[in-house]
Amino acid sequence: MKADGVFAGGGVKGLAFAGALESTAKAGYDEWGKLAGTSAGAITAMALAVGYDAAGMKEVFETLDLDAIADYGPLGEVEIPVNLAEDHGMTRGQALLEWIEKLLASAPAPAETFGELEARFGPERLQVVGTDLAHTRMVVFPRDVHLYVDEHGHRLDPGEFRIADAVRISAGFPYFFPPRSLRDAETGKDGVLVDGGVVSAYPVFLFDTAEPRHPTWGYRLYSGNPPEKPPYTEIDGIAWPVDMLKAIVDTSMNAFDKFATLAFGPRTISIPTGDVESLDFSLSQEQKDELFDFGRDAAAGFFAGEPTGVNTFGAIPTAVSAAGSPGN
């Protein structure tokens, strides 16, 4: 059977997607149409888009050398202050880009640009979410590439944009990886492009239409309470300024996506990730295996319930309207 897939962000916790995809294939969904993702989810969506299957996905994540991705420089973590001052990131970000490029080049259906990918699989095969901090907007690659220009002032061609560059932007966790720059066509100023999770860690709505041809399954990672339970952050005591700042950041990044998870619950596979942190680059093999098992078990339980892929097109606008203040 065929389905579209959308994968949320989660840093190194994205290893759980490999297990979830194994159970998805066992449920009969072994062909993908359109794919989208943010951050770690962008890497997963990209790999599926260029032909890696469920078994291949496990190998993909096993090739990810987490220590190498944290490329501080020849002197290691001593170089962090210099990296931050010069490039606004703790690491150089080059190792992650090169790993992505290698995945694309060695894929069953290798592709360098979005145009090459769509020529083989059709339009909207892959959508990758990034954030332009300077212009305060979500950027969906390749759809929004035309918003930017090259050094000669010519608008960028979505079909010629490199997949690896888009995924590197989407996975560029702020401060840890340096942001990327693209010149905005309207303002003439450089955009500051970072992790798509800043605006939407779970863009499950990207492929929604009034009459979908097949279901869109969403894959979302969570730690702590399940997403259907209300979260709570204690903001009190001597550390309240830090607690409040963290709560502001978490709310700005996740409030809409938590709402979307409820709106799109019938087609969301929620995967617990235990106590693993998004930027924990020192995972043991036991932790990696545990993440895989979390994903496999969560997806197996989801499909055991015989989900129908309920079409929730328009659910968010309707719910937002209903939740408005009286008279709106």
Model regions and ranges:
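Patatin-like phospholipase
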Residues: 1-38, 46-328
